[in-house]
């Protein structure tokens, strides 16, 4: 199959692509587009720090020198992952514009897979692949729709965190038919970002299974959500204050060090 992956230029997307692309490339032709960020760059100091560790640290400080090394680490940078693609990964921040639609059509995908992509697809984009658009959402649907929902689950004291694999059926956010929900125990010693990253091994396995089902010309079983759930935007200062009072952290550099070091050759 021809599969187009839509992702965001951040750490979690890269971790997910490292899990997916080597396996998908064995059987499928892959192309990929990325958004630079989700929403606008935050001005709150706490969220700005999170943005630095998720995005700026990789894109401006960590990955450029690694890309110039002759060897590769256990995880690949975005440029390194391009080896699994039919063409280098392309920026696409305007997928609903005429040029954006043309870019998606040029890949001629049978299936589109969205992972943390920072833009909303309109119906013209959704209708391009004849098999449809899959999305791997880092939260339990329909309860936790929107962005940074691991934050909301931690704030609520949830003992388990979830990812949801679902179809994007229309332009509404995180409302499509649900294929599977994968849970992992909350790490009480982890931070928001480390707990979010822990969702992707099981989430990507579910995604690979669904793609294998489609490749076999079958349809994954999918169920329409039984309620609209709750939609969350970025946390405001009150939510952040409550998060910190509960003893949580957005980022713990010590917890991220093993992940970041995995990009360096050993």
Model-predicted regions and their roles:
Residues 1-266:
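One-carbon transfer enzymes
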């Amino acid at each position: 199959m021809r599969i187009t992956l839509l992702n965001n230029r951040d750490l979690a997307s890269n971790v997910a692509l490292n899990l997916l692309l080597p396996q998908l490339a064995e059987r499928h032709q892959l192309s990929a587009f990325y958004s630079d960020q989700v929403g606008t760059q935050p001005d709150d100091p706490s969220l700005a720090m999170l943005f630095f560790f998720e995005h700026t640290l990789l894109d401006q400080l960590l990955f450029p020198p690694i890309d110039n090394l002759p060897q590769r680490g256990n995880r690949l940078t975005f440029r390194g992952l391009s080896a699994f693609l039919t063409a280098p990964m392309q920026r696409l921040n305007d997928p609903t514009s005429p040029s954006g639609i043309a870019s998606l059509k040029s890949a001629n995908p049978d299936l589109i897979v969205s992972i943390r992509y920072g833009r909303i697809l309109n119906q013209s984009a959704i209708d391009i692949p004849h098999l449809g658009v899959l999305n791997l959402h880092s939260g339990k649907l329909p309860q936790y729709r929107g962005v940074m929902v691991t934050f909301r689950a931690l704030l609520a004291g949830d003992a388990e965190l979830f990812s949801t694999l679902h179809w994007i059926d229309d332009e509404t956010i995180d409302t499509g038919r649900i294929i599977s929900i994968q849970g992992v125990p909350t790490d009480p010693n982890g931070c928001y970002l480390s707990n979010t990253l822990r969702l992707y091994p099981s989430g990507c396995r579910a995604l690979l299974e669904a793609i294998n089902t489609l490749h076999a010309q079958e349809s994954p079983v999918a169920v329409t959500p039984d309620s609209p759930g709750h939609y969350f935007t970025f946390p405001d200062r009150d939510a952040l204050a409550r998060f910190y009072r509960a003893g949580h952290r957005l980022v713990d550099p010590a917890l991220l060090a093993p992940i970041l070091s995995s990009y360096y050759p050993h």
